[in-house]
């Protein structure tokens, strides 16, 4: 749709037409995003699988320089013992250490609603986001959805933060030096300076989820609970599996069982406080459903 909107000259929230630039590879696309952000242009990109891995070196730079952007990823598996192009979380989990926040959706409607949360939070906190959903299972699903009106989102955009971002753009009129080399005694200290930005992310995501919930009538939380209030067995999962899990939970609870599910939306930064608040106090057993194989680890990434 972005190509169509650009070709049609559709105007975005900022009164501009969107320029779509296709690069020679995903590595080139990530480099172009980095340069575009440094020049003060709000920029986003779309990728998946091995293509996302090619972007990792630039992702470290983008996150390290606190450049707000969103990478939309239809999460897909990575070729290992054989090629497979279908959905799992191997690609996005390879990016956990880059400094990108990670927001996950489980349905086409959730993608519509929460993508806005990723963009708004990135602008306010300066932390870049991976906004991901399951490849094929969600990315290629035909589903009737409710589309938010642009005018409903406009009041939520932190225009002061947009102005701040643009004021930091590289320009010959206000020359600055960025991206220099540092020795260990200063590098480690400067690397820690970003912590307050990441600490602020869960609260800001929660704020914008509440605003989107007001617009759509659909409730969103960092960790959404579904099931019996007095559940004794709970599964924790992320992505399209949550849709099937709801059906199973309804069926089992109707038969007298006490089960529930916690759907993870904000995976990074991970808020233990919000997770514990979502799990019923009656819970005795928890099962974590992962979609990534991490050989040699004590548990998979979500676990």
List each language-model region with its residue ranges.
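Short glycine-rich or small-residue beta-strand-to-loop segments that form or flank ligand, phosphate
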Residues: 19-22, 43-47, 101-105, 232-237, ...
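Conserved thiamine diphosphate
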Residues: 85-135, 147, 159
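Short, solvent-exposed amphipathic alpha-helical segments in soluble enzyme
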Residues: 2-5, 60-63, 119-121, 146-149, ...
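A generic structural motif
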Residues: 13-20, 72-74, 132-134, 258-267, ...
